[in-house]
């Protein structure tokens, strides 16, 4: 039976804490609850075990699909998957080694050097990185709304707290660009704990900011000031932090023809009857533009495993192998909106899922 949690709302607590277990509904054989975490009597994925996975709301649907399939093939293994956001997931994952910490974490961006340092300081020295595939960060609007076309400069100028180092005065899109409609700026997007927020900063806001040569020069002369000017988002209500529940974000945007939303491509792909993509820099996201990375919001997504747990839980190794089998072109995850890697990158990801080589910190520099 499945032990995969429904995607919790934005205020849901971690299932890794006792006080939140009653807030999340799971279906689970009683025997699995009593199984010893470190038992490996059968020496493989069939061993009674429990895998705990946290992290990105973007990667959540893909990992959930793999977990469902994996549990059907391995009834002795139960899998918990919780959507916490990338940043919160990394914090939990890197908190230490042992039964009360996650075995894996989903991420809609690559792990940061600072996060890997936290892992190491807490005894997590074998962080295994598996690239899942490619996703596209998208800006969406209701399918009933008048289609919008934005540049990254427009988006940055609308959302920045101090666009190009100046006070934010724009109330409507027309204030940003005379060619845009005179509707109030209202964008629903990810909170700071989300990897999608990091991607919004890096892929959209920084690029829009650096369309001004002075901002590129600022990066060289004062990187801290550049980061503040280019990525700090206004807090006057024009940008609304919508939590980690992307399905709820889709519902809110589809009900408001004047609102835009920021989320991963897979949620757009699953809800084309409700929302459409906003054209950015003359491009709309699709499988082709994301695969070849020509779409400005294209990004790799990941799952990370804790190498220290594999001996006690050999099911982790088998779970990653199952994940790798499902990510290929024409595979089950493609039908759920995952954009597979091109052949060379796919082969490298498959090799990593087999080798399980710990991440080299130097590769993050």
PLM features: residue spans?
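Flexible loop/hinge segments at secondary-structure junctions
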Residues: 38-365
């Amino acid at each position: 039976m499945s032990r995969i949690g429904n995607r919790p709302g934005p205020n849901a607590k971690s299932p890794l804490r006792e006080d939140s277990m009653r807030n999340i509904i799971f279906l689970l054989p009683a025997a699995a609850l009593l199984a010893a975490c470190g038992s490996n009597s059968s020496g493989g994925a069939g061993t009674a075990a429990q895998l705990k996975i946290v992290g990105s709301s973007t990667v959540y649907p893909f990992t959930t699909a793999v977990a469902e399939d994996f549990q059907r093939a391995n009834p002795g293994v139960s899998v918990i998957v919780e959507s916490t956001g990338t940043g919160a997931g990394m914090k939990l994952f890197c908190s230490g080694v042992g039964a009360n910490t996650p075995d894996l974490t989903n991420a809609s961006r690559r792990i940061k050097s600072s996060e890997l340092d936290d892992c190491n300081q807490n005894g997590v020295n074998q962080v295994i990185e598996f690239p899942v595939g490619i996703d596209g960060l998208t800006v969406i609007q209701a399918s009933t709304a008048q289609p919008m076309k934005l540049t990254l400069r427009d988006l940055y100028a609308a959302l920045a707290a101090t666009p190009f180092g100046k006070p934010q005065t724009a109330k409507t899109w027309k204030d940003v660009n005379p060619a845009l409609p005179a509707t109030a700026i209202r964008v629903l997007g990810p909170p700071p704990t989300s990897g999608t927020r990091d991607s919004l900063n890096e892929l959209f806001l920084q690029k829009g900011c650096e369309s001004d040569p002075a901002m590129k020069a600022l990066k060289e002369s004062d990187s801290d000031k550049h980061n503040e000017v280019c990525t700090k988002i206004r807090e006057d209500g024009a940008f609304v932090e919508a939590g980690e529940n992307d399905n709820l974000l889709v519902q809110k945007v589809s009900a408001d023809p004047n609102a835009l939303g920021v989320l991963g491509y897979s949620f757009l792909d699953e809800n084309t009857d409700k929302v459409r993509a906003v054209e950015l820099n003359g491009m709309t996201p699709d499988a082709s533009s994301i695969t070849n990375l020509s779409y400005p919001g294209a990004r790799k997504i990941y799952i990370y495993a804790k190498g220290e747990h594999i001996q006690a839980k050999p099911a982790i190794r088998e779970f990653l192998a199952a994940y790798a089998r499902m990510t290929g072109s024409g595979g089950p995850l493609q039908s759920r909106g995952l954009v597979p890697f091109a052949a060379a990158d796919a082969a490298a990801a498959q090799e990593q899922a087999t080798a399980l080589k710990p991440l080299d910190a130097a590769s993050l520099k």
